[in-house]
C-alpha cells in the first residue's frame, strides 16, 4: 500500500488536522459525505488570532466528525522554542534582523503530537491543509512518519476528485451553505496568516509582490510601529536567565515557561519588537517572502545573546553561531528530531546554555530599536580592568609581555610576506601604484 493516498479511503478512519477554517471544514464534511470516517484533531498552540479554541472541536462534530479532540500543545511548543533559542537555531536574517523559525517549530510540535493522538484512537491515515508548493507538506510528512511508521497520508488537496468538486474558496463556501451550515467566507485579506504563541507568519497574495510590504500588515502580536499615529513609549525591561532558561521578567519570576513567554510577548508587542521582512529559500529551493512577528522570542534572544557574548570565548561563540545556522536549516526542513539536529542542539544546550546565568536590562523603543542598559552575571569573562587605560594594581600583563607577544608574530608575518612574493612571481599579485601593498591581478590567463 502506498504511503500517499491519492483517493479518499472510504469506510476507513481518516484523521484531519482541523483548524475550523473554511478549507478544513469543507474537507471534513466532504469526506463524510463520500463515505470516509473523519476524525478531527486541533492543536492548541496559543494562536493569538483564535478567539475560542473549545468551539473548534464542536464545529468539527457538526460537520460530521466521528470524534473531535483539542490537543494542548502549548507546553511542548514553548519547550521546543526555548531549545531553539538556546541553540541559536535561526538561519534566516536580513541586515541583522532575525526570523525565529516560529512556524517550523510549530510544525514539529503539531506533526508529532497530533499523530500521537491519532494513534491513541487507532487512526493511521492523516490529512492536513498544506499545499504541494509549500514547506509544510514535507514537514508534516516527515514528522508524521517519525511518530507512526504505519501512517498513510491522504490530503484532499492532492485528490483530483476533491479539486474538481471544491477547487476554490467560493466553491467551498457554496458547498457548506448548501449543506445547511450557513458558512460564510471571511473577508479576504491581502495576505494569509499562520500563528502560534511563538510568532506569526504573514505571506502570500499581495505580499508575494516585493512592492508590497509591512505597511499593509495588521500585526496580531504587537503594534504597527511604522504608523505615526501609533504611540509607542520607551520602556525599560529586565530579563533574567538561569542556566540558559529564562526565569524572570522585570523582577517577576515565572515557574511556567508558557506564562513567561506570553508576558514576553506582551512586553515586546507593545513596541513591535521582533517584526521582520524576509526573503528565504523554501525546502524545494524556490524563494518565498514572509513578514514575521515574534515579540517575546526577540526580547529573550537579545538578552540571551548578550549573556552569551559576555560569558563565552570567541571560539565557543563561533561554534555556537555556525552550528546554530546549520540547526536552523534542519529545523526549517522538518528535521528537528533527526540525529544530526539532536547532536547540534544538545551540544549548545549543554556547553553554551548551561553557563548562561545573569540579567540584562534593556530600553525598548519602536520596532527593533533598543539599547542594552546593563549586563550582570556571575559567569562573565568580561572584566574591564584587564584592558583598562588607567593604571591598575596587579595588571594581568605588562608592556614587556606585549612586546614578547608581538615579537612572536614575526614568524607568521615572515611566512605571509614570502607567500605574497610567490603569488607576485606567478602573476597573481602586483604592487599597487604608490603603495607597498599587493593587489590582485585579473585571473583570466588570456
From Swiss-Prot:
Entry binding sites for L-aspartate: 131, 135-136
Q: Which cellular component, as a GO term, is one annotated location?
A: cytoplasm
Query: Which positions in this protein are listed as binding ATP?
Result: 17-25, 43, 129, 131, 136, 194
Q: In which pathway does it act?
A: Amino-acid biosynthesis; L-arginine biosynthesis; L-arginine from L-ornithine and carbamoyl phosphate: step 2/3
Protein's name in the database = Argininosuccinate synthase
**What GO terms in the biological process aspect are recorded for it?**
argininosuccinate metabolic process; L-arginine biosynthetic process; urea cycle
* EC numbers, comma separated: 6.3.4.5
Q: What is its main location?
A: cytoplasm
**Subcellular location, in the record's words?**
Cytoplasm
Q: Which family does it belong to?
A: Belongs to the argininosuccinate synthase family. Type 2 subfamily.
Q: What UniProt keywords apply to this chain's record, in alphabetical order?
A: Amino-acid biosynthesis, Arginine biosynthesis, ATP-binding, Cytoplasm, Ligase, Nucleotide-binding
Q: Which residues form a coiled coil?
A: none
Q: Which Gene3D superfamilies match?
A: 1.10.287.400, Argininosuccinate synthetase, chain A, domain 2 (3.90.1260.10), HUPs (3.40.50.620)
Positions with a binding annotation for L-citrulline? 99, 135, 139, 192, 201, 203, 280
What gene name is listed for this protein?
argG
Q: Which reaction equation describes what this protein catalyses?
A: L-citrulline + L-aspartate + ATP = 2-(N(omega)-L-arginino)succinate + AMP + diphosphate + H(+)
Amino acid at each position: 500500500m502506498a504511503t500517499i493516498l491519492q483517493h479518499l479511503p472510504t469506510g476507513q478512519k481518516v484523521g484531519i488536522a482541523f483548524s475550523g477554517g473554511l478549507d478544513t471544514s469543507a474537507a471534513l464534511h466532504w469526506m463524510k459525505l463520500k463515505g470516509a470516517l473523519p476524525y478531527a484533531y486541533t492543536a492548541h498552540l496559543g494562536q493569538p488570532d483564535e478567539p475560542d479554541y473549545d468551539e473548534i472541536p464542536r464545529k468539527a462534530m457538526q460537520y460530521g466528525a466521528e470524534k473531535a479532540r483539542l490537543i494542548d500543545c502549548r507546553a511542548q511548543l514553548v519547550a521546543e522554542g526555548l531549545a531553539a533559542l538556546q541553540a541559536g537555531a535561526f538561519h534566516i536574517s536580513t541586515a541583522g534582523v532575525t526570523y525565529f523559525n516560529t512556524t517550523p517549530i510549530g510544525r514539529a510540535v503539531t506533526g508529532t503530537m497530533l499523530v500521537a493522538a491519532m494513534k491513541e484512537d487507532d487512526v493511521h491515515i492523516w490529512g492536513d491543509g498544506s499545499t504541494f508548493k509549500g514547506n509544510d507538506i514535507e514537514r508534516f510528512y516527515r514528522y508524521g512518519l517519525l511518530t507512526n511508521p504505519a501512517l498513510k497520508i491522504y490530503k484532499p488537496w492532492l485528490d483530483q476528485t476533491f479539486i474538481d468538486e471544491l477547487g476554490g474558496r467560493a466553491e467551498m463556501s457554496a458547498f457548506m451553505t448548501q449543506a445547511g451550515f450557513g458558512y460564510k467566507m471571511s473577508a479576504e485579506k491581502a495576505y494569509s496568516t499562520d500563528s502560534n504563541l511563538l510568532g506569526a507568519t504573514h505571506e502570500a497574495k499581495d505580499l508575494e509582490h516585493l512592492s508590497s510590504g509591512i505597511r499593509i500588515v495588521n500585526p496580531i502580536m504587537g503594534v504597527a510601529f511604522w504608523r505615526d499615529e501609533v504611540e509607542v513609549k520607551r520602556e525599560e525591561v529586565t530579563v533574567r536567565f538561569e542556566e540558559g532558561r529564562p526565569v524572570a521578567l522585570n523582577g517577576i519570576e515565572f515557574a511556567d515557561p508558557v506564562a513567561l513567554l506570553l508576558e514576553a510577548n506582551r512586553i515586546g508587542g507593545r513596541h513591535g519588537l521582533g517584526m521582520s521582512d524576509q526573503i528565504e529559500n523554501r525546502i524545494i529551493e524556490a524563494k518565498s517572502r514572509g513578514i514575521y512577528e515574534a515579540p517575546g522570542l526577540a526580547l529573550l534572544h537579545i538578552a540571551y545573546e548578550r549573556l552569551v557574548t559576555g560569558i563565552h570565548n570567541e571560539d565557543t561563540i563561533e561554534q555556537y553561531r555556525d552550528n546554530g545556522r546549520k540547526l536552523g536549516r534542519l529545523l526549517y526542513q522538518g528535521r528537528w528530531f533527526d540525529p544530526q539536529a539532536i547532536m547540534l542542539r544538545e551540544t549548545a544546550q549543554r556547553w553554551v546554555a548551561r553557563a548562561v546565568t545573569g540579567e540584562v536590562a534593556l530600553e525598548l523603543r519602536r520596532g527593533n530599536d533598543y539599547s542594552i542598559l546593563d549586563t550582570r552575571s556571575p559567569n562573565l569573562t568580561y572584566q574591564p580592568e584587564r584592558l583598562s587605560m588607567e593604571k591598575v594594581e596587579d595588571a594581568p600583563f605588562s608592556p614587556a609581555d606585549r612586546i614578547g607577544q608581538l615579537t612572536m608574530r614575526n614568524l607568521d608575518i615572515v611566512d605571509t610576506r614570502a607567500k605574497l612574493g610567490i603569488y607576485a612571481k606567478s602573476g597573481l599579485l602586483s604592487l599597487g601604484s604608490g603603495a607597498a601593498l599587493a593587489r590582485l591581478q585579473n585571473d583570466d590567463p588570456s
